[in-house]
């Protein structure tokens, strides 16, 4: 399958997807990022891991992703800025502010581009803070992407959600499934599910 990661930063998500231990790594991954410094680091990591045939870092504005094919991808992933413009970015550096606040793009920009890149029936995977959940769902639907699966992220079992994961389908029918909380930590460190994502397997104890 073909994947495009928006707001990819230094390319952590594409690199994790292509770990050798992954059972079904994507055939092709585009990583879109607007910050030149981040793309330089991304390029370096791709070269050092011999993944140039699979991962394609792209320096561009996601609002106008030049060189990225439309209606081509099976999956679009994105970890977008969480906070609205004006909510504290004056205290941050330009790079930090752009990563955390909607200065260079907002939720509607993300949804518009995601819809243009996905094949019909393709999936969008997005994470956001719970405060913006309504904004995400409304924007997804307005751009033809139907929310299908939602999962809250907690540090430990019974904790308060600090992040929400949402999967939507382009052209999908209404109906959403709520999964059990994703627990980042267990008593012995990372949870089994967290280890599966990062390492492709459960970590041995002891």
Where are these regions (language model features)?
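Conserved SAM/SAH cofactor-binding pocket of Class I
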Residues: 1-89
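Residue-level detection of beta-strand scaffold positions
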Residues: 8, 14, 55, 123-124, ...
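Residue-level detector of flexible, active-site-proximal loop/helix-junction positions
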Residues: 64, 154-157, 172
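Mobile active-site "lid"/loop adjacent to the S-adenosyl-L-methionine
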Residues: 80-109
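Conserved Class I SAM-dependent methyltransferase catalytic core
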Residues: 104-161, 165
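SAM/dcSAM-binding transferase cores
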Residues: 160-206
